[in-house]
Amino acid sequence: MKKNKVLSLFLALTMVVVCAFSGVCEAVAVQGGSNIAQNQGASSVKLSNGKVGSTSKAKNIKSGNYMYYSTRNKIYKVNVKTKKSTLVYKGKGDEEFYGLTVKDGWIYCTKQKVEGRALTFPYVFRVKTDGKSAKVLKKGADPVVYKGNIYYIKLSFDDKKSNIDENFQTLGIYKMSLSGKNDKVVKKSSIVEEFIVYKSKIYYTAMSETSYNCYLYSMPITGGKAKIIMRTTEGLPTNLIAYSDYIYFNWGGDEENYDLYKIKTNSTKKIKVTSKADLEDIYDGYIYYTVEKGLKLDAYKMKISNKKKTKIKTNEEIISGFYVEGGYMIMCVNYDNPNTKDNIGVYLCDTNGKNGKVINTFSIY
């Protein structure tokens, strides 16, 4: 089944692994812009990589010797040297966290309530890295911290209802201060799917409500007129990542995997990078991606300068995507231990798949 990552909110990990893994596993959850509303009440699996669009992918989760990640209603930090995990914050039993960003002693992410196997009511949330001063900032998802502000997809819903409100709406891209004040509209739109911020510009995707057209736009971070970078009727570009003045994204492909493209930030010409490559991350001159083959998920990295591909071999079976930072990778793997009901492992290793260890475990619903 092709991963519709245009689409997620959680490290994020269709199995229903609901694991918020600081930017790591996204397992096929559709949640972005207008898709957020459409998918409330649908089972989803994510690792903090999760994405409400594709934005919920974790961003900058390493601070010093620690990487931060989440599993369901818990946020952890792991010492990359000792591989020891420590609980930072525990939410209520019906909450989940994903799409973590760590900045100046604070963790920013999306918090969402869970009803059965359904994810409902997303909020922009922050908590200190010592677990104190936890606070919901706004109704919304996919927070991006940039130059002293939080950019996010603002949502409207009645959280007093037992399940997602039928009037659930996407309002557009907004910004607010790091404490949740001075909330202002940047781009009013009910069809925003996902966005990224790069060099004082916002790049976002949207689907037409009246046609089959899908778009990739750019616009100044202050708002104003948006420029069409790409228009297509063959599916929505997704998994946006900016790197070295290019926007990389997934689009097209076959039943199981996306193809990988890039567009220079000052151009409208898309360039195919490679086929069958579900984009996970870009770090230090390498593109990290996964290839789905039936029930199997293989991981690769490709050097941008010469397109040399290397398979990343781990001692564990990867079940979802991953996040790369500071020479380390964190991902979700299959966990088989007859002495516990847990069947998903959080796995930390180097960027070659070596020196790995399961640093935490949890069970799918």
Task: Indicate residue ranges for each PLM-predicted region.
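Blade-level signature of beta-propeller repeat domains, shared across WD40, Kelch, NHL, RCC1
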Residues: 325-336, 341-365
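A short beta-strand motif characteristic of beta-propeller blades
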Residues: 43-51, 84-90, 132-138, 181-187, ...
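Sec-dependent signal peptide cleavage junction
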Residues: 17-39
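Beta-strand-rich domains and repeat architectures in extracellular enzymes and scaffolds
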Residues: 42-76, 92-99
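Short loop/turn segments that connect beta-strands within beta-propeller blades
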Residues: 79-83, 127-132, 177-181, 220-224, ...
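Structural motif
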Residues: 72-77, 115-125, 158-174, 210-218, ...
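Repeated scaffold domains used in trafficking and secretory/extracellular systems
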Residues: 53-62, 94-103, 138-147, 190-199, ...
